[in-house]
Amino acid sequence: RATSDGGSPSIQSLLPAIYPLLKSEFALDSGQIGLITLTFQITASLLQPMVVMFTDRHPKPWSLAVGMGSTLIGLLLLSRAPSFPVLLMAAALIGTGSAVFHPESSRIARLASGGRHGLAQSIFQVGGNIGSASGPLLAAFIIMPRGQASIAWFALAAMIAIIVLGRIGRWYQLQIPNLRRPAMRAAGRAA
């Protein structure tokens, strides 16, 4: 699980790490770089509570793979973006991937904890922090020397993550009936 949360942040942290490349290739000014950041953050942060309002009532086991799929499309678009508006679309897709991925992945970490919720959340956070730290290093060694098109190599990691997350989603789907039983009992006691 820690590796699945590490994968998402490492891909997301590529975006700010390649700002110098994007600034050079597209002749962007600081305001445009700021708009890329704003676009990513709005979708990654502000969209997430809306996703949670829905998934708290209706768990979506496949949202991990779907979120990573959005990130994958964003990466591919970023690797081939011919213009600033397309860069913004790519940033929005990567941010949307994060917003969709993280609520259910946090819930799955708790579910897989075996009752050790604090430990599970800590491992989840460590995975994310390792991912966030590794993204800029990967960008420095892979993308910066080879250019924008090399971003597509990270799509391979996203595809592998989608397969792994699909398997985790299948496991999670099997757990959902067990989650509903205690909630139904608690609702019965409250009535």
Predicted features by range, described:
Residues 3-20, 28, 51:
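Extracytoplasmic
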Residues 18-45:
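Extracellular/periplasmic helix-loop-helix junction of adjacent transmembrane segments
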Residues 124-171:
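Helix-loop-helix hairpin linking two adjacent transmembrane segments in secondary transporters
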Residues 167-190:
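Flexible cytoplasmic inter-helical loops of multi-pass small-molecule transporters
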Residues 46-84:
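Conserved MFS/SLC helix-loop-helix module at the cytosolic interface between two early adjacent transmembrane helices
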Residues 90-127:
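Cytoplasmic helix-loop-helix junction between adjacent transmembrane helices
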Residues 13, 41-49, 132-133:
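Residue-level signature of mid-helix packing/kink "hotspots" within the transmembrane helices
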